[in-house]
Amino acid sequence: MRSSRRSVSRTVGLWLVTATLAPAAPAQTSAPAVSTTPRVGGYLQPRFQDFGDSATFLLRRARFAIEGSINPWASYRVQVEMRTLGAPAVPASSPLSLSATDLYIKLSQGAWGATVGQFRVPFSLESLLSSTTLETNERSRIVNAAKRDIGVQAEWRWPDRVVLQGAVVNGEGPNRGSNPDNRMAYFARALFTPIKGLDVGGAFEGYSDSTGADAQAVYRRGRWTGRAEYIREHNRRSDVHATGWYALAAYTLLPERVQLVGRVEQFDPSDRVATDRETGYLVGLQYFIRGDAFKLVADYEVFREQVVQVTNNRAIVQMQVRW
């Protein structure tokens, strides 16, 4: 009976979101023309990577997307990914994996918006940024990857002033066909622009067994860009806290051609272990051939462990083509 009530409440919630965002059509006014022709896009990121005592060429990402508008207030996006890094060998003779990343319908009306399907959850600033626009080849250790899940998200925007986002998702991650524990995960994020060029905000995530909080800021002025985040997560079952932060600065040396990047990051996976903290120091360069559509990104990161040093310094040279 409880499961049935949850199902009914979710259905009613989705209906209310759609009904709220769907504008009532005036009786004698025709809707503005909107192209419903699907648009095809994607990007490739082949790279050379030297990590510790191993070196290899690999395909970091290969993503292909189809997106389009259904009417003036509804659109969709479908994106799939082929990759070799960290992919399970299926079949065993091939290290290439295929999976879906974005699978959603987006609704918008004025300052309000909603997303239904599989999308990036509103939490970390760096995880919400596309890998095609990042200044570095890899996200920081505490962020690691863009979090995606299946559910519904609502947002409200005051242009150049405020962004408020909230989401309810299964909490099982992307490409999951069920929610075994029947418990939802909840996300909330607020971003404010007190002065031009400066965005500051915070976010919260709540799972059935863990919670997390994020403080974030980004500043852009002239040729300079600065971005920083602090994340703290708590696993209630083990009572372990994980913390991490990063601070990044980028300077455009030659407009539309060369950008220098530096980053310091730190990650402590457990406050129960006194010797597991790791600090990383990165220097890098972006060379733009045609903006983010065609560029080379090279960076080198030195990691320093709290006690025992490990051979895990990382050098990456990656080419990106986006269309």
Language-model features: where?
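A broad detector of the eukaryotic-type serine/threonine protein kinase catalytic domain
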Residues: 171-173, 233
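Short helix-to-loop capping/linker segments positioned immediately adjacent to catalytic or ligand/cofactor-binding
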Residues: 174-178, 188-189, 202-204, 237
